[in-house]
Design a protein with these regions (language model features):
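Mixed-charge (Asp/Glu-Lys/Arg
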Residues: 1-34, 39-174
Length: 174
């Protein structure tokens, strides 16, 4: 039997987090695929924020958590979502992290970090035990070691301001 409707794990985790943390908000699931995975409205349903959700399992249980994504740059550029939400559950601390940012800023950073030689962008977002967030694809072992000891510095690769950054959604729904 084929299900009529399903949501993926990342959408579920985002929706569950919102309903637990912001019980006054409403979470909606669109009935057709338009590039918007979840719609979040304020209590009166007068203001809305659209989310594109990307999920990855944790690939590094020892050093915080690391997720891997493969993006199409054209989809990011054409995205109608207000925010992209990267969902990264951690093996080590049993907590789910959310990296939340507008698609325009995401694409700007990817261009600065990886260039735009092709239309596919592979991304490794890493959350350290000290709650810093980095785009680490393409870095050598020395830089990865610096990330692990909280000594690395690169403005474009530093995604910490977007780590669990629900306040930007709160502002839009006020």
């Amino acid at each position: 039997m084929r299900p009529l409707f399903t949501i993926h794990a990342g959408e579920y985790l985002v929706g569950e987090h919102i309903e637990r943390t912001y019980p006054q908000w409403n979470v909606w699931v669109p009935s057709k695929d338009t590039g918007i995975d979840l719609l979040v409205t304020n209590a009166s349903n007068q203001k809305a924020v659209s989310l594109q959700v990307k999920f990855s399992k944790d690939f590094n249980p020892m050093q915080g958590s690391i997720g891997w994504w493969n993006h199409d740059s054209a989809k990011i550029q054409k995205s109608k979502a207000d925010f992209w939400v990267f969902v990264l559950p951690s093996f080590s601390d049993k907590k789910t992290n959310f990296i939340i940012l507008p698609p325009g800023e995401l694409l700007r950073r990817f261009k600065a970090i990886h260039g735009m030689g092709g239309k596919r962008i592979q991304s490794y977002l890493r959350v350290t035990k000290k709650k810093r967030c980095w785009e680490s694809r393409g870095l050598g072992k020395a830089d990865l070691d610096l990330i692990d000891i909280d000594q690395f510095s690169d403005r474009d690769r530093d995604f910490t301001q977007y780590l669990n950054a629900w306040k930007q959604i709160e502002k839009k729904l006020k």
